[in-house]
Amino acid sequence: MRVSVFAVGRMKAGPERELVERYFDRFSKAGPPLGLEFAGVSEIPESRGQTAELRKAEEAQRIHEALDNGAALILLDERGKALGSEAFADRIGRMRDDGKRQLIVAIGGPDGHDPALRTRADLVLALGELTWPHQIARILIAEQLYRAATILAGHPYHRS
């Protein structure tokens, strides 16, 4: 299953970007033996629409256009369900085992995700009840994708 991360907005060079790249590099090495191929990060420009609803709709359209038929979609959203790392790994493993060829993990912009995109999502995931800056959300999902691969592989990185 090809795994991509779509993020609204750009991440500037710096230590946060380096940490994200480090975890995605680890994931790209750990994933293939498990049937998980990291396809990279796609940065979606923030909409310049006049209202939050218009901005969310435009950003959702860009994400929707990238989805293959039958692709799995995980949205990071504060209204989502908080999962532990093992449950998150299990969900990814089940998506892979169910024959999904593509998984997109989407990080929304400052206004969040459009309700229609939340309805389309296979999983709406919250990173806890706290609000996180975009850069930290990227770090967290990069680390959790790597952690999920190690859990699925039975590697000792994750200690429950």
Swiss-Prot record:
Extent of the signal sequence: none
Keyword terms: Cytoplasm, Methyltransferase, rRNA processing, S-adenosyl-L-methionine, Transferase
Stretches that traverse the bilayer: none
UniProt enzyme class: transferase
Entry-linked Pfam families: SPOUT_MTase
EC nos: 2.1.1.177
Catalyses which reaction(s): pseudouridine(1915) in 23S rRNA + S-adenosyl-L-methionine = N(3)-methylpseudouridine(1915) in 23S rRNA + S-adenosyl-L-homocysteine + H(+)
Highest taxon in the source lineage: Bacteria
Protein family (similarity comment): Belongs to the RNA methyltransferase RlmH family.
Designated name of the protein: Ribosomal RNA large subunit methyltransferase H
Organism the protein comes from: Brucella anthropi (strain ATCC 49188 / DSM 6882 / CCUG 24695 / JCM 21032 / LMG 3331 / NBRC 15819 / NCTC 12168 / Alc 37) (Ochrobactrum anthropi)
